[in-house]
């Protein structure tokens, strides 16, 4: 049988999602725990591989097993065997044609900035700290030119291995909640470092270092060297993955869970 899981993790101490030799990864920890509960070796597939230091509240994975367990037994057993910074949020048996990556229709990320004179001691690894004055409204305005199906060459990592730079961004909102600035973005898929590169460029607009029109000029230039710096990994969260409605996968609050979903720009769209 095939089982899908919703996963949350703090990526601070991991060298990314993907299993690697001699360094810790989220995938390796999950496969180790799953293999223990299933009592056989388990290999997993995910909806989106996150980089070192990047977090998730809405990662989705699937695996195949012949072990018979209730959904609650999988959840409780896994959470008892996983490290404290990885947790299972839901479990559901799915059809064998389901694939965590290829069945997905969209991904959604949030980038959380703590905009304050002083760095935070609590949540320090879960936000990106900027002490400069930042205008979130200008960032939001500048980002609207990124909506639609477009060539995002200017915002892809130099080493990105995707065959095409074209992506379809269906939602982009930047809002402020007290000292927190949240960039909320959804697309059919993302290029390597795309969200962090967009964030880094929008921050230059928010700080008054570049005009609002600059983002549209960057998009048209198709040149990564002209864009802003890559924003730090610690503020980025994979918060949701969309699937066809007929799959009836659980829908939970997007997170990060300490961020009020009632805040402007962070509710469901």
From Swiss-Prot:
Pfam families, per database record: PseudoU_synth_1
Amino acids binding substrate: 109
Catalytic activity field: uridine(38/39/40) in tRNA = pseudouridine(38/39/40) in tRNA
Active site: 51
Gene Ontology terms for molecular function: RNA binding; tRNA pseudouridine(38-40) synthase activity
Segment forming the signal sequence: none
Biological-process GO terms, alphabetical: tRNA pseudouridine synthesis
InterPro entries named among the record's database cross-references: PsdUridine_synth_cat_dom_sf (IPR020103), PsdUridine_synth_TruA (IPR001406), PsdUridine_synth_TruA_a/b_dom (IPR020097), PsdUridine_synth_TruA_C (IPR020095), TruA/RsuA/RluB/E/F_N (IPR020094)
Organism superkingdom: Bacteria
Class of the enzyme per the UniProt entry, highest EC level: isomerase
Quaternary structure and partners: Homodimer.
Entry function: Formation of pseudouridine at positions 38, 39 and 40 in the anticodon stem and loop of transfer RNAs.
PANTHER family: PSEUDOURIDYLATE SYNTHASE, TRNA PSEUDOURIDINE SYNTHASE-LIKE 1
Family: Belongs to the tRNA pseudouridine synthase TruA family.
HAMAP family the record matches: TruA (MF_00171)
Annotated protein name in UniProt: tRNA pseudouridine synthase A
Species name: Aeromonas salmonicida (strain A449)
